[in-house]
Amino acid sequence: AVPELDTDQWLAVIEKCRSAGVTQLTFTGGEPTLRHDLIKLVQAAQWFVTRLNTNGRMLTSMMCKDLRAASLDAVQITFYSAEAEIHNQLVGVDGYNDTLNGIHNALAADLNVSLNTPLCSLNRDYLSVVKLAHTLGIRYLTCSGLIPAGNADTAASRAVRLTPAELEETLRPAMEYAAANGIEISFTSPGWLPEDTLRALGFTQIPSCGA
């Protein structure tokens, strides 16, 4: 396994990114909120547009206030379902309440919050996530297909993967509700649906491979 970089090593990486003219940094993982030095690293990256990708379970009120003070620009929280049982089944732990509390804490700290939902056959009621986001005052959402890669490349994960037709059927009511309520949804899985289908559903940004 590749050893984890310590604080000074990451600070050096951040400085190299600045010197190279990089404009955006995303803190992701794994789970970045497990690092004791996360606030310090975000603070050191203030001249970038900074984002945090997290499961939200460690987002205490104090951490969210500290992230806000460190000038974090946006936090994206992975949220699988508005139903606790389904969310917990997909993440493999009883983490729904912790994640929901993290969302509330991030919003209370006036962080720019978005929700990300990988879609599969178990959480096809994506509309309920969009409705919950609207209730919470969250206006930006992302979703994707379930990508069977790495540890997720199992027969079980491939069995719950949505077909293009199922994915379109899942997205249509969510997109209609979003359009009617001022919510922006981005689909981030390139190649999963034809461009004309995505545009017909109301997506204005078509995902492309960054390779």
Question: What would you call each of these model-derived segments?
Answer:
Residues 69-73, 80, 85-210:
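Radical SAM enzyme [4Fe-4S]-AdoMet core and its adjacent flexible, acidic
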